[in-house]
Amino acid sequence: MPRDGFTLFCTDCKMENYISKKNKKNTPEKVELKKFCAKCNASTLHKEKK
């Protein structure tokens, strides 16, 4: 099964900071990770955006 690409955006400033891949069969729900945002200069929640 091919892996699909997606971007992660900061929930505070809405800036798209990270690009990642996932297997939709194993993880069908949207990804939410706490990552560093350079614009906010802090670790914030990042959500999946297609």
Swiss-Prot record:
GO terms for molecular function: structural constituent of ribosome. Transmembrane segments: none annotated. SUPFAM superfamilies: Zn-binding ribosomal proteins (SSF57829). InterPro entries: Ribosomal_bL33, Ribosomal_bL33_CS, Ribosomal_bL33_sf, Ribosomal_zn-bd. One of its GO terms (biological process) is translation. It comes from the Bacteria. Keywords: Ribonucleoprotein, Ribosomal protein. GO terms for cellular component: cytoplasm; ribonucleoprotein complex; ribosome. The keyword Isomerase does not apply. Belongs to the bacterial ribosomal protein bL33 family. This is Large ribosomal subunit protein bL33B. The lineage of its organism: Bacteria, Bacillati, Mycoplasmatota, Mycoplasmoidales, Metamycoplasmataceae.
